[in-house]
């Protein structure tokens, strides 16, 4: 508003009314109902979070080696930072509520002005001017789509505006009191983030905008929300109102900076897909076990060091990604996930896979690369549905004999371990198509004699071991199309044959065995005169004994 017009002389009612409306139009757009609710809920959230942080700070105890004054300085700094952070988090919410308060106040002013115009004037005349229409507010955008995907944005088109208070709604034509022909300036809905109206480089969602989005999504019964890499770096936690999204089936919050999830996440009762990869989550709330319809859960690339016991309740879960965390163990409850088809726990600190893994009776793919495994449980043989097993870069010395029961196994990768041998029982897993036992270095000196049973094998990697001789049954691997044997002291077949490719090796082994068999048939051992004499004496004795009988 132009401050120079504040002392402008107004000689008529029309001028006063126009000035009132000019001042009113100068206000920023009024926040929507959902925004106001979100702001109030956000402030409550922050207050609870602050209280929890302050209580945690108060519980900290000083070590005997730390000076009391120094420890007190640290405590006060932590408290000061919590207060500073909370002010930053609610700054937008407070500003929004202040704006709503001003609009409410101006509503009263407009109503009073309308009453003055409608009532007899001070000079005894009655104004012929109609009452002033009330201020309007923004309304939630009515959208036929049931998903909000911030990766695919479309322009927001203004819809009909509605009043915050229905008693103020006027359906008459705009009054001619306004020079522009409108009762109030058109306002674009504020509930959605600017990324919905701009290009791919739109600014990211702040806490208040996220809270507003949740409110409007809850009322619209939104089914899908994609906020991948769409939250500001300062946004480390999610508002409790997240639990209102009971109709949500898919939620993508990946590639943000989330540290903690609210307990109310259990309220997402319809959720089937939850993607939280590439955040900084250190612990999961027990309420995650209430997501009973969850089918897909991606928690990769976080900072998890444990899993809640409630995990066992996710019996519909089919895909679970726990890769790139700090997990030292997998809980026994993992065996309760009877619908699980794909489990990825690579790049953790896991030393042992629990025996209960045998309860994952639907498991098709298990990846546990880059851990500290020393062995695989015998129960692995119970998972007859398993097709892919990858345990690269571990400390495994031997494979369980029960692997012969893996009737569906197609791919096995145990490279970069400490394997001393491959059990003969593995050769009963005749469905194997890919086998990688390379890079076990000095520990691996031979292949199982019955490796030829793996007639479906197409890829075999035995590189960087100490294997000198291939077994005779190798000739049966007629489907082999990839064979890596470099950095082995191979004697049979010779290195030049191995370099010609897998079929050359198979043919060489076949020719070698046939030649050896042919020689063994041609060479018949001759009896010595001692053997002949002994044989004839023996026969004579047998014959005479038969005659006596």
UniProtKB/Swiss-Prot annotation:
| Keywords of the record | Leucine-rich repeat, Phosphoprotein, Repeat
Query: Which PROSITE patterns has this protein been placed in?
Result: LRR (PS51450)
The record's section on InterPro entries has: Leu-rich_rpt (IPR001611), Leu-rich_rpt_typical-subtyp (IPR003591), LRR_dom_sf (IPR032675), LRR_domain-containing (IPR050216), LRR_R13L4/SHOC2-like (IPR055414)
Q: In which tissues is it expressed?
A: Widely expressed.
Q: Which residues lie within the region annotated Disordered? A: 119-167
Low complexity composition-biased segments: 119-140
Which residues span the membrane?
none
Q: Where is this motif: GVYW?
A: 501-508
Quote the biased-composition stretches of kind Basic and acidic residues, using this chain's numbering: 154-167
**Cysteine pairings via disulfide bonds:** none
* Compositionally biased region (Polar residues): 141-150
The family this protein is said to belong to? Belongs to the SHOC2 family.
Q: What job does this protein perform?
A: Leucine-rich repeat protein that likely mediates protein interactions, possibly in the context of signal transduction.
Put simply, this protein is called Plant intracellular Ras-group-related LRR protein 4
Species, as recorded: Arabidopsis thaliana
